């Protein structure tokens, strides 16, 4: 078969194109491999820092070369960003701290972080940067997000006034953290000398009960391992771990940090050495500035705990700190619909401040009833809580007491309530409830947590009343349950109850009610008993 000239030219062109395509592909592959290799040595900042008078660009080390110092101080680039979060605008030493670290370790990125732009402005040395967290309408969302401004493997969280005297101290912290591998220790800390002694604490956070409990932790020979710190310390954490927290740089920093890490099961290891110096002691030059700082810290702690849904802190010294409702403020939840308060939908129980108010109101009301000669008994769900817990049911939102109707005239607080309400000398509000023929005692005019008093009278040996609610437990019952009334422990006091509590409760709620807890309206929200 003869090949024409045109066929020969076409075949040659095809072969030539295939050769060109082959060499172009090889060249592209080699170029990509070269770029990948170069990329291992240099990590570039994703975005410029906002409000800094210039971009972060590449985090430049000593001698103008990009890179981070490794565990031995001679790696290709800095592994640690020094971050200072806590300082006061009216008196601080952020510039001195930055100078201290950059003088010893000029290759390390130094980042000061503030909620708003400080006034007076910070005076920072070259190599230190300021990041303002509050967003500005003329900037992209990434501009105020710290995770876009930290490009190193670790973050070293330092307090104001600290000084780096030992350049190798940071490498010691890195080695300690890396030595923990993938275990529960995810943070390593070193003390700051000549400040308040740092203490290792155990922290247990119970979001369901709105509570955080701090307790002292024992020290070990190679350092203490715990879940929180109290006092001044320098803390090293992996950048990935820090920015996987819901609020990585909350204020106060340690309070925010350790609540979140404790919930994740992470631990912090507090070393005895190295130690960091404090070049300003005390941190504030006047008692007035110290008072201002303490006041701002208290306000910031309250704001933080409320944002985390923590209303009670049990401190290591046994004292309580409360961040919930009080006699002067409204209760923590609104009007209850379908017998299901809003907090149950959040998989939480009654806030501890609300339980405290209910206990105080119950104790107060029972004392007045007993003093006045009014026979009463723990009724309904309140009796159920007393039998199960010797306290209020953890998710209940009021207290119910039954009383003898014929005894109402004995009590000055009750007998004149047919019209209006009464605010007594201790701020409790006594009223005839608008929902029915019963009485209600509120914690205060502002806080409507309450005790309900249900008047019953005997008829043919049965305790009854004239109006009823739709609750299944609101039924008549034999008077023999009240003859006699028996004392029992309830909410820190001794109160009276029916004499056969199991039979009384099973008459009202059904068989097995004591052993099988359930929310008031399972059709709306059912209790997961496996989590009890």
Regions found by a protein language model. Give the residues of each.
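C-terminal catalytic/acceptor-binding lobe
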Residues: 12-19, 39-67, 220-225, 230-232, ...
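N-terminal signal-anchor transmembrane helix specifying type II single-pass membrane topology
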Residues: 1-47
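Conserved catalytic core of nucleotide-sugar-dependent glycosyltransferases
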Residues: 165-246, 425-456, 463-471
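Short beta-strand-to-loop acidic/aromatic patch adjacent to the donor-nucleotide binding site
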Residues: 151-165, 402
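Active-site nucleotide-donor binding segment shared across nucleotidyl transfer reactions
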Residues: 366-397, 409
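Short, acidic, metal-binding catalytic loop of nucleotide-sugar glycosyltransferases
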Residues: 75, 96-108
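Conserved catalytic core of two-metal-ion nucleotidyltransferases
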Residues: 9, 16, 347-372, 416-508, ...
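Active-site nucleotide-sugar/metal-binding loop of Leloir-type enzymes
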Residues: 141-155
């Amino acid at each position: 078969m003869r090949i024409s000239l045109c066929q020969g030219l076409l075949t040659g062109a095809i072969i030539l194109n295939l050769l060109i395509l082959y060499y172009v592909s090889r060249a592209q592959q080699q170029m990509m491999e070269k770029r990948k290799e170069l990329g291992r040595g240099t990590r570039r900042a994703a975005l410029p820092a906002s409000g800094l008078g210039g971009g972060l660009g590449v985090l430049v080390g000593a001698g103008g070369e990009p890179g981070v110092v490794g565990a031995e101080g001679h790696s290709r680039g800095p592994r640690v960003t020094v971050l200072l979060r806590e300082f006061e605008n009216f008196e601080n030493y952020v510039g001195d701290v930055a100078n201290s670290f950059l003088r010893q370790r000029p290759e390390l990125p130094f980042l000061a972080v503030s909620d708003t732009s400080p006034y007076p402005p910070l005076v920072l040395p070259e190599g230190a940067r300021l990041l303002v967290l509050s967003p500005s309408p003329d900037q992209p969302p990434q501009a105020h997000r710290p995770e876009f401004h930290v490009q190193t493997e670790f973050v070293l969280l330092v307090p104001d006034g600290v000084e780096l005297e030992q350049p190798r101290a940071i490498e010691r912290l890195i080695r300690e953290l890396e030595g923990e591998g993938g275990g529960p220790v995810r943070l390593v800390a070193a003390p700051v000398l000549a400040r308040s002694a740092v203490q290792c604490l155990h922290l247990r956070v119970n979001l369901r009960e709105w509570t955080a409990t701090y307790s002292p932790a024992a020290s070990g020979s190679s350092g203490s391992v715990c879940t929180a710190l109290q006092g001044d310390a320098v803390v090293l954490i992996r950048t990935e771990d820090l920015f996987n927290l819901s609020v990585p740089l909350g204020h106060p920093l340690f309070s925010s940090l350790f609540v979140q890490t404790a919930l994740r099961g992470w631990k912090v290891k507090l070393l005895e050495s190295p130690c960091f110096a404090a070049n300003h002691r005390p941190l504030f030059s006047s008692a007035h500035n110290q008072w201002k700082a303490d006041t701002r810290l208290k306000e910031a702690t309250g704001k933080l705990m409320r944002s985390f849904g923590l209303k009670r802190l049990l401190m290591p010294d046994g004292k309580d700190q409360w961040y919930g409702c009080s006699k002067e403020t409204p209760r923590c939840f609104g009007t209850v619909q379908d017998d299901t308060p809003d907090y149950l939908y959040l998989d939480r129980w009654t806030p501890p401040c609300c339980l405290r108010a209910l206990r105080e109101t119950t104790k107060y009301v029972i004392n007045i009833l007993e003093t006045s000669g009014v026979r009463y008994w723990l009724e309904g769900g309140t009796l159920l809580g007393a039998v199960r817990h010797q306290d209020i049911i953890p998710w209940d939102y009021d207290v119910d007491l039954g009383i003898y109707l014929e005894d109402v005239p004995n009590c000055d607080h009750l007998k004149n309530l047919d019209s209006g309400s009464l605010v007594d000398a201790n701020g409790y509000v006594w009223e005839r409830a608008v929902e029915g023929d019963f009485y209600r005692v509120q914690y205060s005019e502002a806080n409507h947590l309450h005790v309900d008093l249900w008047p019953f009278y005997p008829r043919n040996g049965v305790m009854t009343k004239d109006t009823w609610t739709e609750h299944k437990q609101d039924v008549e019952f034999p008077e023999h349950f009240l003859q006699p009334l028996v004392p029992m422990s309830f909410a820190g006091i001794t109160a009276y109850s029916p004499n056969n509590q199991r039979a009384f409760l099973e008459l009202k709620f059904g068989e097995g009610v004591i052993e099988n807890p359930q929310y008031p309206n399972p059709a709306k929200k059912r209790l997961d008993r496996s989590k009890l």
